């Protein structure tokens, strides 16, 4: 008998994976902030706020937002490689799913390719656009416990 993973198990796995991804990212940001002298920049502003008309303030602002943009790109690429890499591996699961004995398959129960896992990852963005989390809630109410991104990618999340 096939045991589909429902909404709550999948939510816990998602939270675990979010923690696994976020902690190193936060540590990296803090290290970069402290070692590049970026924290000292804010101490040099009167009242801790930059002067909007000052050229140095503008340059710092551009550099700051450029760094944020680079970090955002790296975060997306890192998350994509994390999810698609683990879900297409012999584990068939991210570490968060593995802890809960969950795994990702195609509709026949076979492991997924890196391409399908990539499609599933980016289909989650579509799922996130649906108001009230309905795209995710589908995992609790559909027969095969599929969220919208699972339907788009033709995948299942099963329990061992």
Q: For the regions a protein language model found, what residue spans apply to each?
A:
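Hydrophobic alpha-helical transmembrane segments in multi-pass membrane proteins
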Residues: 18-30, 71, 75, 79, ...
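Membrane-helix interface segments in multi-pass membrane proteins
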Residues: 25-76
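FKBP-type peptidyl-prolyl cis-trans isomerase
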Residues: 101-104
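Juxtamembrane cytosolic face of transmembrane helices
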Residues: 2-12, 18, 82-97, 111-160
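Proline-rich intrinsically disordered, low-complexity coils
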Residues: 24, 46, 50-52, 95, ...
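Short, acidic, Ser/Thr-enriched surface-loop or helix-capping motifs
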Residues: 106-108
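Helix-coil boundary and N-terminal low-complexity module in membrane systems
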Residues: 1-25, 42-50
